């Protein structure tokens, strides 16, 4: 039986994830906080394997529930409806958009924060450490020499296997980064976060040339061995969290131009 991916969030990342899922033959139920009617154009582009639904409908239908959301949105997630579900946590902590004292004090990781709210769900961290464009463009079929390895973290082996199989199906090899408590090793500021999956933009380009290069240039593959080494050598960053200033300027310019005001504010 074909599995269904329920997606809560239909922005840049949610749209890229939905495209990868339908390309791999998964059914997708895409939702957002504004209602199914606001996703009709995207769903039409995605084809017959995708449909729009309410958040509750996406949760009910999904074998995996993906959260391509700002971290600040986690408290609005319906914990009761998500009970028993495997949740793919794609959120990241960026304090300039939303601040949390427990995260700042290293009391827990961002995925532990999500798991605490979704106390009866099984949270797996993954598909969070690159942007929407490269999430889609870096995907490769099994056996391709350019296939990338990405990390996951979580506390439940069965849920990890389910998510790992999904990620392999949509174009990635997977390395286990440990528990949610250890997921700081793959959070913003860690060696495996973002930069290995984005192209290096050369000096001397105009702003438009930088953007085009960033979107179109090939990225060298991250092998499983390289991914493991990056995870193992990670040192917990302090202060914690990502910043736009630490990102490639071309990425920031494209993100701010395309992202919704709701995303930027959070």
Regions from the PLM with identified roles:
Residues 1-45:
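NAD(P)+-binding Rossmann beta1-loop-alpha1 motif at the extreme N-terminus of oxidoreductases
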Residues 52, 122-126, 175-177:
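General beta-strand structural signal in soluble alpha/beta enzymes
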Residues 91-141:
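Rossmann-fold NAD(P)-binding glycine/threonine-rich loop
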